[in-house]
């Protein structure tokens, strides 16, 4: 059985037949009931028959150490894929990524579908958070989930024609007819946005009173972005609500099919635009698995250092805007002063501020500049005192506590059902942080703690955990400063680094290869890889499929904010509108992370 913390190369292609869950599945369903796919994802990948899907899912959910979280669910257009040796015939496929917290292990189930029969039973009967994932898969691929409670578009407008992630759907604006907004089209779009309660199983009233339906957003300041929630109200009490997303959708996964492996890096920064280099980490690690690259120790520590700087930067904005949502304004200005110091440090190292696009496949863009250690030392001396002032001045305030303690509270069972990760999950008492549970980029070499709550995740607990996470990030940065390894800032690998000049003078073919890789992009081996990380807002992951080309065949981006917004109705029903504002502030999301 593979130890997830073992120091074997992360890029090995494995079928994971030694994983206990494979034996458990074979004992229950027979040795020939499914096909095991060898990949570089680091998890067992099992192709099962459509008719077995719900039975297998239920079996995994009821094991002694169960697979309790549906981490991700999406699809792939397999029609143009050439490297499918040993896999079931498929025009399309749907994958289900499940996590067992007790085992600290995952499994990925795949179902093959024919183009003339794109139907699969809904997974919502087992995992309620499958709802949005199935809607997105239908929206972007046209795969129907039989029995889904309300299968309708979620990313694209309701009037949209076609399914954008299909391979025969255009990927460039120049392939479309020029856009025209006529009065008739404008009226049609406005009508499509009109909320009809009956479509969502809501009643307009009872025998004695009518409910009010209120649009919060998509331009409300407390919605934290282009985000609409339709509220069903009885007075100020929220009877039910419907989150409406997609206004910020930019087709990030489709772009991954039209960019080279290197040129997609700047797009990762903008998936969650506050995270900076944190967003680059899972992508470059996943590509390095495909390429078979092991990076130098110096690269690992530099990446951790930049990631923790951006984690602090994001948490400061989150904490201060949460306080602002509750009613206090001053901490926002204090936080922006502190964030400016981080941006100055990031700019000195990378040359950029919010979106450095600085990590590279195999390393980083360039080495650390002279004086980086002095700037980091100054910040580490400055920040702890400021953090203490935030707690004393605002977070211990009795009014803030009264507005946030016990609000939008849920337990571990609810968190797992809705795919909640990050501070929201840890507040329920579940100690699961990817940096500790499944260390990447050398996190296993750092001494830090994971703050965990007492069993109930409410608004106040989520914020206070982030404050403690800030302190732990400062501990990590202190270790980066004191223990920065010597060595190269990039791996010596032909898929990512130009060959040394002395080699090119002796072997011209190395220069030819370099020319092709710079002009067209490196050709990655045909395989699949996966990498999850502990991002600023929860678990972020990239699932990449290479067909032996200069571009990704399929880029799946799983973000924490998408799952967290789906949970809103379950957590806020029966509360007041004012509680919803506090709850939204406690989630920590940006709409670019939700909509991609």
Curated annotation (Swiss-Prot):
It is found in: Cytoplasm; Cell inner membrane. It catalyses: a quinone + NADH + 5 H(+)(in) = a quinol + NAD(+) + 4 H(+)(out). Residues 210-596 are annotated as: NADH dehydrogenase I subunit D. The keyword Nucleotide-binding does not apply. InterPro entries: NADH_DH_suC, NADH_DH_suCD, NADH_Q_OxRdtase_suD, NADH_quin_OxRdtase_su_C/D-like, NADH_UbQ_OxRdtase_30kDa_su, NADH_UbQ_OxRdtase_49kDa_CS, NADH_UbQ_OxRdtase_CS, NDH1_su_D/H. Residues 2-186 are annotated as: NADH dehydrogenase I subunit C. GO terms for biological process: respiratory electron transport chain. One of its GO terms (cellular component) is membrane. It is a peripheral membrane protein. It comes from the Bacteria. Keywords: Cell inner membrane, Cell membrane, Cytoplasm, Membrane, Multifunctional enzyme, NAD, Quinone, Translocase, Transport, Ubiquinone. The keyword Acetylation does not apply. It is an enzyme of class 7 (translocase). Its EC number is 7.1.1.-. GO terms for molecular function: NAD binding; NADH dehydrogenase (ubiquinone) activity; NADH:ubiquinone reductase (non-electrogenic) activity; quinone binding. NDH-1 shuttles electrons from NADH, via FMN and iron-sulfur (Fe-S) centers, to quinones in the respiratory chain. The immediate electron acceptor for the enzyme in this species is believed to be ubiquinone. Couples the redox reaction to proton translocation (for every two electrons transferred, four hydrogen ions are translocated across the cytoplasmic membrane), and thus conserves the redox energy in a proton gradient. In the N-terminal section; belongs to the complex I 30 kDa subunit family. In the C-terminal section; belongs to the complex I 49 kDa subunit family. NDH-1 is composed of 13 different subunits. Subunits NuoB, CD, E, F, and G constitute the peripheral sector of the complex. This is NADH-quinone oxidoreductase subunit C/D.
């Amino acid at each position: 059985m593979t130890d997830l913390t073992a120091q074997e190369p992360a890029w090995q292609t494995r079928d994971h037949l030694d994983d206990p869950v494979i034996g458990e599945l074979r004992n229950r369903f027979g040795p020939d009931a499914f096909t095991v796919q060898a990949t570089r994802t680091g998890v067992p990948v099992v192709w099962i028959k459509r008719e077995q899907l719900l039975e297998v899912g239920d079996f995994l959910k009821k094991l002694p150490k169960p697979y309790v979280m549906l981490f991700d669910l999406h699809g792939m257009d397999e029609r143009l894929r050439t490297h499918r040796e040993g896999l079931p015939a498929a025009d399309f496929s749907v994958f289900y990524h499940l996590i067992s917290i007790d085992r600290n292990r995952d499994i990925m189930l795949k179902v093959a579908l024919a183009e003339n029969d794109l139907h699969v039973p809904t997974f919502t009967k087992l995992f309620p958070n499958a709802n949005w994932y199935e809607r997105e898969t239908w929206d972007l691929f046209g795969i129907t989930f039989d029995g889904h409670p309300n299968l309708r578009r979620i990313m694209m407008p309701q009037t949209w024609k076609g399914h954008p992630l299909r391979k025969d759907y255009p990927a460039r604006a120049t392939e479309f007819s020029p856009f025209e907004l006529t009065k008739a089209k404008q009226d049609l779009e406005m009508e499509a946005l009109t909320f009809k309660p009956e479509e969502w199983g809501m009643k307009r009233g009872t025998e004695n009173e009518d409910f009010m339906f209120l649009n919060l957003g998509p331009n409300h300041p407390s919605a934290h972005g282009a985000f609409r929630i339709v509220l069903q109200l009885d007075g100020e009490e929220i009877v039910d609500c419907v989150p409406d997303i997609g206004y910020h959708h930019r087709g990030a996964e489709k772009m991954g099919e039209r960019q080279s492996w290197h040129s997609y890096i700047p797009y990762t920064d903008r998936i969650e635009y506050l995270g900076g280099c944190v967003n680059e980490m899972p992508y470059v690690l996943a590509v390095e698995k495909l390429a078979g690259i092991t990076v130098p120790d110096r690269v690992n520590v530099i990446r951790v250092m930049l990631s923790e700087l951006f984690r602090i930067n994001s948490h400061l904005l989150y904490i201060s805007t949460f306080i602002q949502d509750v009613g206090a304004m001053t901490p926002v200005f204090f936080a922006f002063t502190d964030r400016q110091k981080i941006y100055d440090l990031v700019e000195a190292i990378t040359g950029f501020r919010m979106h450095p696009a600085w990590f590279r496949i195999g390393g980083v863009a360039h080495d650390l500049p002279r004086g980086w250690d002095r700037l980091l030392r100054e910040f580490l001396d400055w920040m702890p005192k400021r953090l203490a002032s935030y707690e004393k001045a605002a977070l211990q305030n009795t009014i803030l506590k009264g507005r946030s303690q016990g609000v939008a509270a849920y337990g571990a069972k609810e968190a797992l059902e809705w795919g909640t990760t990050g501070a929201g999950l840890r507040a329920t008492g579940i100690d699961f942080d990817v940096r500790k549970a499944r260390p990447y980029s050398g996190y296993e070499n750092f001494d830090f703690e994971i703050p965990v709550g007492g069993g109930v995740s409410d608004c106040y607990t989520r914020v206070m955990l982030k404050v403690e996470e800030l302190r732990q990030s400062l501990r990590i940065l202190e270790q980066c400063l004191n223990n920065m390894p010597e060595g190269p800032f990039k791996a010596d690998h032909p898929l990512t680094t130009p060959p040394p000049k002395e080699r090119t003078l002796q072997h011209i073919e190395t220069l030819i290869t370099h020319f092709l890789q710079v002009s067209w992009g490196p050709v990655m081996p045909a395989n699949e890889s996966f990498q999850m990380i502990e991002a600023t807002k929860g678990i972020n992951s990239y699932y990449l499929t290479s067909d032996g080309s200069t571009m990704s065949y399929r880029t799946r981006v799983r973000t924490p904010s998408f799952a967290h917004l789906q949970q809103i109705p379950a957590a806020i029903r029966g509360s007041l509108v004012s509680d919803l504002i506090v709850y939204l502030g406690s989630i920590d999301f940006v709409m670019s992370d939700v909509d991609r």
